Amino acid sequence: MIRVARESFALVSVIGFVWMMCTVANLVA
């Protein structure tokens, strides 16, 4: 169960990072 939580947290972190980069790119563009 700990492993699943860690994997989910990692997935959310990656998605959040990509979303943030896309948002910044749109603001700059």
Curated annotation (Swiss-Prot):
Chief subcellular location: membrane
GO terms of biological process kind: cell division; DNA damage response; negative regulation of cell division
Keywords: Cell cycle, Cell division, Cell inner membrane, Cell membrane, Membrane, Stress response, Transmembrane, Transmembrane helix
Topology of the protein relative to the lipid bilayer: Single-pass membrane protein
Subcellular location field: Cell inner membrane
Transmembrane segments: 9-29
GO annotations of cellular component type: plasma membrane
Disulfide bridge map: none
KW Cell cycle (keyword) present: yes
Induction of expression: Induced in response to DNA damage.
Role description: Inhibits cell division by binding directly to FtsW to prevent the final constriction of the FtsZ ring.
The protein's assembly and partners: Interacts strongly with FtsW and to a lesser extent with FtsN.
Name of the featured protein: Cell division inhibitor SidA
Protein's organism: Caulobacter vibrioides (strain NA1000 / CB15N)
